[in-house]
């Protein structure tokens, strides 16, 4: 009965594929906990979480695209003002995605249980044993002290970045409204 527009069919097909892939990742993740140790790999957990965020973001993008079709004239009048803001917000969204993945590593390794004090990790801000694994770079993915420290530092960075971006955006939009 042609209830779904033809241009929407490829987008819905991608959603269907991503959902199936999520199921496959979920099975693969749980399979890692069905052996001797009843826990899942932090890598598989993080991949499963990351794909879930991608699916959610894609669904929002498609939904907002449907709304945008009816609001196109409003968007073109504001496009000159908001181009830089839009690009910056995409970059921040990407950083938020990596923050979520970092949280997946914290959850998968149970690193959050190692230091339950905040803002200090134990008695210091920078804990002892940071990046002590060999090879050095593997600490970011497998050492619980380093994983939790990185997650916290990423949170501080994003807080400052988003706060600064919010102030910049408000000022930019206020000045453009005053000029018009």
Residue ranges and their predicted role:
Residues 1-180:
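Polytopic transmembrane helical bundles with strong interfacial aromatic enrichment
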């Amino acid at each position: 009965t042609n209830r779904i527009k033809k241009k929407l069919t490829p987008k819905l097909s991608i959603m269907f594929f991503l959902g199936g892939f999520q199921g496959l990742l979920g099975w693969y993740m749980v399979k890692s906990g069905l052996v001797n140790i009843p826990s899942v790999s932090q890598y598989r957990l993080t991949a499963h979480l990351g794909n879930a965020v991608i699916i959610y973001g894609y669904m929002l993008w498609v939904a907002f695209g449907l709304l945008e079709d009816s609001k196109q004239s409003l968007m073109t009048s504001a496009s000159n003002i908001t181009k830089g803001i839009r690009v910056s917000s995409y970059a921040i969204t990407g950083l938020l995605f990596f923050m979520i993945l970092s949280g997946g590593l914290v959850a998968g390794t149970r690193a959050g249980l190692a230091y339950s004090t905040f803002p200090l990790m134990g008695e210091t801000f920078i804990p002892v044993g940071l990046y002590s694994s060999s090879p050095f770079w593997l600490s970011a993915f497998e050492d619980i002290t380093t994983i939790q420290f990185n997650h916290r530092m990423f949170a501080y960075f994003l807080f400052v970045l988003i706060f600064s971006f919010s102030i910049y955006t408000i000022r930019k939009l206020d000045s453009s409204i005053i000029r018009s």
